[in-house]
């Protein structure tokens, strides 16, 4: 019996060892799935960055990056306050997605100490915003920069998604947005005898009033929808600054107006009291629509773009696309 017991014990021990090996194999198989595609190298505006693990603690230093990461289901541990928002705080349209996000200072001068204290494993920004502090940032965590902001927002999303390992999710969201934009354009043309109306974008800031052209975030969205632009904005540039005496350049079938921060700091009052403004066809036809600056100008991502689509549908008097 003792020999049999010893044999049985040997079998039991062997089986347990095999089971343990099997469990280890499952664990090994599961680990890559949790961080599939990592480590990886990401080429960007400042060079190439090695990201060893799927990022979990992300800091974003501009609004486009904030829109992108929250759209992809990530609540950043830290973010900057928008540079046009002097009262501080994050964009209202993203408030539900940044409840635990820490403010790391203004966009123009992010607080390096606050960022370091958050122990991020990825930092996202752009060369145009933060080239001067890139070396400090990359000393804290892997840092990925796009070249600039605004017009290349779709390309920027691809870079951010690559750094996060969420390329498929980003592409699916972009496809859905572009489908909505095209559907809206078709509905608008149906209502206007097959012809797309012209759309103008006016922004009042602390300085000369701006007319936004084709190479801007809002300009790309208008193009996706298929709206035409007035001559002053049908240009492959970001924007045109105008004086109150040049505001007639803003006229179009639909005029969308945003105000950056405090209206008292802008020329809004002077412009809209000007006879030239009152003489615009859009003003006379009640086709001027004030829309949120934080989505039309500062959003620079799919979530903001979808809200622009919603605003245009409402202004054009057509159903909001699904």
Task: Annotate each PLM feature.
Residues 132-205, 302-322:
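Extracytoplasmic substrate-binding proteins
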């Amino acid at each position: 019996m003792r020999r049999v017991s010893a044999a049985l014990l040997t079998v039991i021990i062997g089986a347990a060892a095999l089971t343990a090996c099997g469990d280890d194999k499952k664990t090994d198989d599961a680990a890559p799935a949790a961080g599939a595609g990592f480590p990886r190298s990401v080429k960007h505006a400042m060079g190439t960055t090695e990201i060893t693990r799927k990022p979990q603690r992300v800091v974003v230093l501009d609004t486009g990056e904030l829109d992108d990461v929250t759209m992809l289901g990530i609540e950043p541990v830290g973010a900057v306050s928008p540079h046009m928002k002097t009262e501080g705080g994050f964009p209202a349209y993203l408030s539900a997605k940044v409840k635990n996000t820490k403010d790391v200072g203004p966009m123009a001068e992010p607080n390096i100490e606050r960022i370091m204290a958050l122990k991020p494993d990825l930092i996202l920004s752009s060369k145009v915003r933060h080239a001067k502090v890139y070396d400090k940032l990359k000393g804290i965590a892997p840092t990925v920069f796009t070249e600039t902001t605004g017009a290349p927002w779709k390309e920027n999303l691809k870079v951010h998604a690559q750094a996060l390992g969420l390329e498929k999710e980003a592409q699916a969201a972009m496809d859905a947005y572009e489908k909505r934009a095209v559907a809206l354009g078709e509905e608008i043309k149906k209502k206007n005898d097959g012809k797309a109306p012209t759309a103008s974008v006016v922004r009042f800031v602390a300085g000369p009033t701006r007319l936004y052209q084709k190479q801007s975030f809002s300009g790309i969205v208008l193009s996706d929808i298929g709206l035409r632009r007035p001559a002053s904005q049908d240009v492959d540039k970001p924007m045109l600054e105008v004086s109150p005496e040049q505001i007639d350049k803003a006229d179009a079938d639909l005029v969308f107006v945003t105000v950056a921060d405090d209206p008292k700091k802008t020329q809004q009052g002077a412009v809209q009291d000007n006879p030239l403004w009152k003489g615009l066809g859009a003003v006379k036809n009640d086709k001027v629509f004030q829309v949120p600056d934080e989505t039309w100008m500062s959003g620079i991502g799919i979530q903001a773009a979808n809200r622009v689509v919603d605003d245009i549908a409402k202004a054009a008097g057509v159903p909001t696309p699904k």
